Amino acid sequence: MASQSRRRRPLRRPETMVPGEAAETDSELSASSEEEELYLGPSGPTRGRPTGLRVAGEAAETDSDTEPEPKAAPRDLPPLVVQRETAGETWGEEETPAPAPALSLLQLRLAESQARLDHDVAAAVSGVYRRAGRDVAALAGRLAAAQAAGLAAAHSVRLARGDLCALAERLDIVAGCRLLPDIRGVPGTEPEQDPGPRA
């Protein structure tokens, strides 16, 4: 046992001071190495120290590592209803509208001026529309009269054309008729011949 601990004792390292870390002495290094050798050594367990036992597999969780599993709420419970009541809330009261602020004299004058302006603008616009409507109606009447005169003139021209066509047909009938005698061959109607000078 002593020979094994002597063979496994690490070599003494030079002491170096590193800022931010604590320096270990040789006594502390030797004590920690001996504890590791006694705990992990091949010899049997010593008195007064816990022995290490290696088991293949995962390490078991301790009591401090166990976490309580969340439990689902039972489904037969009714849904939770939250009722909120505000302090000072009274039921059955009707909210009355706030009274309108009193209008000043300037605001009244402005309202009257605005009403007069609206009335004048509406009257002017309606007058313009009425005059335009009368002018459009007069133009429509004149257009209707001109249309009637044009229709009458077209009817007169159509009648005159019909009369002229009838007269032309009658003249053609008279010119082409053979029932009338030829007045050029009637005896006694021939012109007298001049006998000439006598000797």
Swiss-Prot record:
Residues 39-54 have a biased composition (Low complexity). Residues 1-81 are annotated as: Disordered. Disulfide bonds: none annotated. GO terms for biological process: anterograde axonal transport; anterograde synaptic vesicle transport; endosome to melanosome transport; melanosome transport; neuron projection development. The keyword Nucleus does not apply. It is found in: Cytoplasm. Residues 23-38 have a biased composition (Acidic residues). Keywords: Cytoplasm, Phosphoprotein. Phosphorylated. The modification Phosphoserine is found at S64. GO terms for cellular component: axon cytoplasm; BLOC-1 complex; transport vesicle. The modification Phosphothreonine is found at T62. Residues 1-11 have a biased composition (Basic residues). It comes from the Eukaryota. Component of the BLOC-1 complex, a complex that is required for normal biogenesis of lysosome-related organelles (LRO), such as platelet dense granules and melanosomes. In concert with the AP-3 complex, the BLOC-1 complex is required to target membrane protein cargos into vesicles assembled at cell bodies for delivery into neurites and nerve terminals. The BLOC-1 complex, in association with SNARE proteins, is also proposed to be involved in neurite extension. Plays a role in intracellular vesicle trafficking. Component of the biogenesis of lysosome-related organelles complex 1 (BLOC-1) composed of BLOC1S1, BLOC1S2, BLOC1S3, BLOC1S4, BLOC1S5, BLOC1S6, DTNBP1/BLOC1S7 and SNAPIN/BLOC1S8. Octamer composed of one copy each BLOC1S1, BLOC1S2, BLOC1S3, BLOC1S4, BLOC1S5, BLOC1S6, DTNBP1/BLOC1S7 and SNAPIN/BLOC1S8. The BLOC-1 complex associates with the AP-3 protein complex and membrane protein cargos. Interacts directly with BLOC1S2. Interacts with BLOC1S4, BLOC1S5 and BLOC1S6. Belongs to the BLOC1S3 family. This is Biogenesis of lysosome-related organelles complex 1 subunit 3. It comes from Sus scrofa. The gene is BLOC1S3.
